[in-house]
Amino acid sequence: MSNIPAELKYASSHEWVRKEEDGSYTVGISEHAQELLGDMVFVELPEVGDDVNSGEDCAVAESVKAASDIYAPLSGEVIAVNEALEDSPELVNSDAFGDGWFFRVMPTDLAELDNLLDAEGYQAVIDDE
C-alpha cells in the first residue's frame, strides 16, 4: 500500500499539494501514481510565470511504461519549478513527496482547496481503481 501523508491535499488525478510558508503550494504526484507509471525517464514542467488552471494539464511525466499528463490541482501562477528533475527524473520515484516535487503555484482562488481530498478521501479513490 502506498504512503499517503495526512498533511497533504490530493486531487483524484493523483497530484498532491503542500502549503508553503509564503502562501504558495508545492505540487507533485503521489507515491501511488509513480508506482503505476514506473521508472521516470523524463519530466516536462511548466515555465515560471505560466498561469495554470485547476484541472488542466500543465506538465508531463514520462516513464518507461507511458507518458502521463500532470494536472494543476489549483489555479494560479507558477512561481518555481523543480529543475533537478531535468537531470534526475528518478527523484519522482525515490522521493515522490519530497525531492520529487514538480512545481510551486501561487493560487488565485483558495476556494479550490475545498475540491481537493484529504488522505482518507484519496485512499478511497485508490481503493476504487
From Swiss-Prot:
The keyword Phosphoprotein does not apply. Gene3D superfamilies: 2.40.50.100. The keyword Ion transport does not apply. Its cofactor is (R)-lipoate. It comes from the Bacteria. InterPro entries: 2-oxoA_DH_lipoyl-BS, Biotin_lipoyl, GCV_H, GCV_H/Fam206, GCV_H_sub, Single_hybrid_motif. Pfam families: GCV_H (PF01597). Binds 1 lipoyl cofactor covalently. Residues 24-106 form the Lipoyl-binding domain. The modification N6-lipoyllysine is found at K65. One of its GO terms (biological process) is glycine decarboxylation via glycine cleavage system. Keywords: Lipoyl. SUPFAM superfamilies: Single hybrid motif (SSF51230). One of its GO terms (cellular component) is cytosol. Disulfide bonds: none annotated. Signal peptide: none annotated. HAMAP family: GcvH (MF_00272). The glycine cleavage system is composed of four proteins: P, T, L and H. Belongs to the GcvH family. This is Glycine cleavage system H protein. It comes from Shewanella halifaxensis (strain HAW-EB4).
